[in-house]
Amino acid sequence: MHLNNYLNNKFLSLPLLAIFSGLLALSAFAAWDVQPKLGYNLTPLPKPVPAPGFTLEDMDEENHSLKDFHGKVVLMNFWATWCPPCRREMPSMERLYQKFNGDNFTVIAINQMEDGDHVFAYTGQLDVDPTFTILFDKDSKVSNSYRVSGLPTTFLIDKQGNIRYRAIGGREFDHPEVEKQIMQLMQE
C-alpha cells in the first residue's frame, strides 16, 4: 500500500515539477529580456549654478577644458561601459548630437575610471559610433566636483557655463521634451 502511494505521488509530482520549472524558466527569461524604458525628464535646478571647471584627456590624449565650450549649450554625461543604462542611452546621445551639433551645442561624455583602450574597444561594438567628445575622469575628481552619486548622471549647461538641468539615470536624449529644453537654452 505504501509503495502504491509513493508511486502515485511520484508520477503526479513529476508533471507538476515540470510545469513549475517551465513557468519559472519562462518568467526568468521574460524578466531578463524586459528593460525599463529610459526616462526623458531633465530636472531644472532652482537657480543656475556655475559648472565647475576641469581639464580632461580624450581618447587621443588631447586635453579639453570646459571653458573650451563656453558659448555653447553642453550636454555633459558621466558614464561607464559597465553601466547598462549608460550603454542604452548612448545611441540617443549620438542622434541628439547629430541633430544639434554646431556653433551653439555639443555633447561631452565623461567616462569614469576606465582606460582609453577599453572604451575604444567598447565604442567599436556599438550600433552607432559616437562622434561626440569622450573624456576620461580616471581619478573621479571631476565627478566628485559635480557630486555625481550614480551613473549615468547628466548635466545640461547653458552658454554662460551655468548648470541648468540635471538627470540621474538613463535618458532618451532625443525625446522632443529634451530637445525643447536644449533649443530654449540655445536661443538665450
Task: Show the residue positions of the predicted features.
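A short beta-strand-turn-helix
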Residues: 48, 53-74
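N-terminal targeting signals for export/organelle localization
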Residues: 1-53, 176, 188
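Active-site loop/turn elements of alpha/beta-hydrolase fold enzymes
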Residues: 112
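Short, internal strand/loop/helix patches
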Residues: 108, 122-160
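Thiol-/selenol-based redox modules, centered on thioredoxin-like
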Residues: 32, 156-188
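Acidic helix N-cap motif at the loop->helix transition within catalytic regions
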Residues: 117-120
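Conserved redox-active cysteine motifs that mediate thiol-disulfide chemistry
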Residues: 70, 78-95
